[in-house]
Amino acid sequence: MHLLDLDVLSREDVLKIIEYGIYFKKNRRKHEKILEGKSVAILFEKPSTRTRMSFDIAVYELGGHPLIMNQNEIHLGKKESIKDTAKVMGRYVDTIVARVYKHRHLEEMAKYSSVPVINALSDLAHPCQILADLMTIKEYKGKFKGLKIAYLGDGNNVCNSLILGSALVGMDTYVGTPKGYEPNAKVVLKAKEIINNYGEGSLTLTNDPIEAAEDADVLYTDVWISMGDDKDKEEVLKIFPPFQINSKLLEYAKDDVIVMHCLPANRGYEITDDVIDGEHSVVYDEAENRLHVQKGVFKFIFERK
């Protein structure tokens, strides 16, 4: 199977991957080598720190061989067609992990690849990040049902995957964005379908940051302008400040709220220093959990291959 976004998973699948992630975290030096004898191509059109390190180390600690290629070594759809790249790589490696600019490139790669393709980030989705986020919420809150999670800022790829992941585990999700910066409309429809299918959770889009943050158990934000984004910086800096997670906004959330950011953070913009470094912040646990939950993704995929 391919993991291009979370809508290919069921609730049971998501909970199983989280369970695997928690297991790998508790048994980091003692767990089984499920990738022994296997090679994993890790492709980066977009530079990365956490994604590259976490996937590289995950493959290594699972006994596999990570083959990392950066933007200067791969030319998806340029010097060679994506079809040819995918077909050839499928004969060399056991899995392809790709961080790309265009989600459609991933879809084409998955169409022609004979091995699983895992989305390590695209302009539409960031599923592995959200699996790590859900694992972090599970660690801190012990549950999903009945929790309110509020995302504030730009309705970007992280936001898209977050509303799918939150829908799958039954949380009540509020997305607070400026007008015109809402998450992808098709993803919103998918999330609402998931909520209707399970009969749990909810999804509310609002342009009011206080409505989003009020009584929240989890506050989440991301950068206002993503890498490769063509947003007008002056416009963003004019209309996004009310959606900043700061001490004032924190007062509207629950006393035991946790604050999340997928990093890297532009401190002083989408989140203030005192909040990201404060007692409610779980950003470093969240970042660490990328490593563990991605091991869980490999285990899940190879069990079903």
Curated annotation (Swiss-Prot):
Subcellular location: Cytoplasm
Plastid recorded as keyword: no
Cross-referenced PROSITE patterns: CARBAMOYLTRANSFERASE
Catalysis: reaction(s): carbamoyl phosphate + L-ornithine = L-citrulline + phosphate + H(+)
Any one GO MF annotation of this record: amino acid binding
GO biological process, one term: citrulline biosynthetic process
EC numbers, comma separated: 2.1.3.3
Amino acids binding L-ornithine: N157, D222, S226, M227
Keyword Translocase belongs to the record: no
Binding site for carbamoyl phosphate: S48, T49, R50, T51, R99, H126, P127, C128, Q129, C262, L263, R290
Pathway connected to this protein: Amino-acid biosynthesis; L-arginine biosynthesis; L-arginine from L-ornithine and carbamoyl phosphate: step 1/3
Task of the protein: Reversibly catalyzes the transfer of the carbamoyl group from carbamoyl phosphate (CP) to the N(epsilon) atom of ornithine (ORN) to produce L-citrulline.
Similarity section: Belongs to the aspartate/ornithine carbamoyltransferase superfamily. OTCase family.
Protein's name according to its UniProt entry: Ornithine carbamoyltransferase
Record organism: Methanocaldococcus jannaschii (strain ATCC 43067 / DSM 2661 / JAL-1 / JCM 10045 / NBRC 100440)
